[in-house]
Amino acid sequence: SNIVISGSSAGAITVMQAEYELCNRTSWAEVLPKDFRYAGVMSFSGAILSRKGEVKYASAPAPTLMLHGTADNLVNYKQIKFFNLGFFGGGKLVKRFEKFGYNYNMYHFIGYGHEIAGSMDTTLDLQLDFIETNVIEGKRRIVEAWVDDPNVYKGVGVQSRKELYSK
């Protein structure tokens, strides 16, 4: 297909989870044709929920762009695990992508929290480059960058859990 799925925060969790379920042909993916594949996945502060321990793909995921703040505690940058139940953020997922040679671009935003979920407009160049090179041209271009830029979007409406849930 020519479909690139993209999401931010809960939407990023949704697109990452959708691709994970599809690659593993779980019951959640049964509604799609057997040969269906996404052309690409773009995640702004996303994660994957696994009920079986470490994230494992039965087939390689579509080219994936991940952007995540290293200090994100709302959608955890690394992981949260309880026995076999785990919630794996971009900082942990990229290690799996690297280990298995998947096609990905990962931008770690040093010291940033969940505000990276709202960075779609300020990271447009990264997105277009990924779509052009990894998706349209089909090149396996791996990028892993640590971004330390005070000019990255720190928009309104991005709150911590404490700010969201305190009275």
Give, region by region, the residue ranges found by the protein language model.
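Glycine-rich, phosphate-binding/catalytic loops in enzymes
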Residues: 21-24, 59, 82-86, 125
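Extracytoplasmic/secreted cell-surface and envelope-processing proteins
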Residues: 50-53, 74-76, 116-117
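Primarily recognizes the serine-hydrolase "nucleophile elbow" in alpha/beta-hydrolase
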Residues: 1-60
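C-terminal catalytic histidine-bearing segment of alpha/beta-hydrolase fold enzymes
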Residues: 95-167
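Short beta-strand/loop motif that positions the catalytic acidic residue
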Residues: 66-68, 72
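Conserved alpha/beta-hydrolase "acid-adjacent" motif
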Residues: 73-89
